[in-house]
């Protein structure tokens, strides 16, 4: 939820028009995350002024607002920092006054964009109101901007002219909750602060010259930092302030009635960032792109650095410095600059009408990529590099706990049975929010598996921290390299599905499913009794991409069904049993979130325990009738439906004589899909429902990629 984007150019001349276009384009590439308003902040015409443009609605509405305000687009800047934001309302309605950026005062001295929720904002707001500050919005973010101004003025009055990152540390000390934020200020021209806690942030670096090293050092205070003192001087520069213009500091008395005054950290481990050193020591032209998502950066650069929780990034004078308040045992001393594997074409629609449609049709390729290089079909071996060293520990586990939300939860449900069958380890599947609410007991001999497409899901991250505190081994199954879950877990698997832009997860679901099956296969490769079963599954996986391609040919038939039998329906029932129960739940979720039609996935065995009361000739029903050990029971459940005048649509295997015979005497329709191994059949069966949800939505004129009230990456509780 929400999206942050920032752009800083240093010794790279850009017009105001180019800067605005870069910021707006960055926001457009964050649209899929979900939002209800947008805004940007850039330097104004005067030396200490800031232009803020914000608007409710789409990014296109913001572009119209900027055009209406008619700023001089031809003014050029050799160095400049601009920030931008797409907002998902958490505090305050979607109104222009609540849009980000939020300002500290009418003079725009400090301007902030923020993702997350500040849980103590009411206390902060009360404190600031008592000190005379007037609030314009209902947001928690405005508290941050005003807190910046208050602490800046307080320290200035007491003789402390703070560096931007020192001031930010004081602000962060007062904040509780989660945040990813950017701040710019007229007091610190051409500088920007980026910091995160529980909300993702990355920084892209673009330079014509090759970087000297592929990392940035983390800078810590010295042991005696925290004691106010007169700064040391070296070469006319304040020690610890790098190439910035020297500032004079004086130790002043603290006023007990004000928030804490800075104990200046003059003795910082601070030097020119090694990554940005030039051969002759002259400044290097460079551009920085700060974002909550790699999709908005890849157009400009593939060199990115992922911030970790409590990192404080300070960009100024063409350099990037990363500060932390304290050194933790075992913490990394650097942040590596990585190369994104994402291609620009992957986040473009191409010939498709919607990203969701594109991603449905990418599944033959995405499922193949999930398995690429990991399965040896000739020798029936599965090798997951990220798990290999940890498998002996996992095999000794007392139980496996799979924790996820939404679609990722369904992929866990879909594979629970095969985990139990192959490993003989009890497996529980938990919704992250419920897991936390119950304070579920977790022990050191448990293995906790966290599944998330984005790797940033807030509830899943909180559950992960909960399990780490209790000493459990943690495994991450994610699609986003460098995400929080991938960094914090002990080991894991990257599903390699490629960027997924549509809010409704399609290809990530099938890739998660396959990654979990491969995990189960790896876990059981030491069991002689499971060899035949493992070979059957591995050979079944080999055929999956081709079988998905075959199922996609059903689209014309499904499109027609959506335009006739399912048109204008208010509710839909999906029946599944065994491995297909997860498919029923996932199919129902897709139809709900994309077409806004009420749909319910039901365990077929529970039909007669209440759900059967809903069945009549008007209720559309979709049932999974593919072949497995539970097929006779599924047939029995469907016969109960038809006996109550129900007219089910059966997803069955090709050339199945049972359904062919029944269709002669019972009013039912079939959608035939290829047959595969029972534990993999859900991969094939979900494709028709993805297509069905898509066409139901398109026929209603719904924006498939941006369903109302939903966000792609849920980074708040």
Swiss-Prot record:
Lineage: Eukaryota, Fungi, Dikarya, Ascomycota, Saccharomycotina
Keywords linked to the UniProt accession: Aminotransferase, Glutamine amidotransferase, Phosphoprotein, Repeat, Transferase
Modified-residue entries (Phosphothreonine), positions: 334
Classification via SUPFAM superfamilies: N-terminal nucleophile aminohydrolases (Ntn hydrolases), SIS domain
Gene giving rise to this polypeptide: GFA1
Protein name in the entry: Glutamine--fructose-6-phosphate aminotransferase [isomerizing]
Task performed by this protein: Involved in amino sugar synthesis (formation of chitin, supplies the amino sugars of asparagine-linked oligosaccharides of glycoproteins).
Protein EC: 2.6.1.16
Naturally occurring in which organism (per UniProt): Saccharomyces cerevisiae (strain ATCC 204508 / S288c) (Baker's yeast)
Pfam family, one: SIS
GO terms, molecular function: carbohydrate derivative binding; glutamine-fructose-6-phosphate transaminase (isomerizing) activity
Enzyme class: transferase
InterPro entries to which the protein is assigned, alphabetical: GATase_2_dom, GFAT_N, GlmS/AgaS_SIS, GlmS/FrlB_SIS, Ntn_hydrolases_N, SIS_dom, SIS_dom_sf
Extra facts: Present with 14300 molecules/cell in log phase SD medium.
PANTHER family hit by this protein: GLUCOSAMINE--FRUCTOSE-6-PHOSPHATE AMINOTRANSFERASE, ISOMERIZING, GLUTAMINE--FRUCTOSE-6-PHOSPHATE TRANSAMINASE (ISOMERIZING)
Active site: 2 (for gatase activity)
Top-rank taxon: Eukaryota
Modified residues (Phosphoserine): 253, 336
Pathway terms, separated by semicolons: Nucleotide-sugar biosynthesis; UDP-N-acetyl-alpha-D-glucosamine biosynthesis; alpha-D-glucosamine 6-phosphate from D-fructose 6-phosphate: step 1/1
Domain Glutamine amidotransferase type-2 residues, every copy: 2-318
Reactions catalysed, as given in the entry: D-fructose 6-phosphate + L-glutamine = D-glucosamine 6-phosphate + L-glutamate
SIS domain segment(s): 390-529, 562-707
Entry's Gene Ontology BP terms: chitin biosynthetic process; fructose 6-phosphate metabolic process; protein N-linked glycosylation; UDP-N-acetylglucosamine biosynthetic process; UDP-N-acetylglucosamine metabolic process
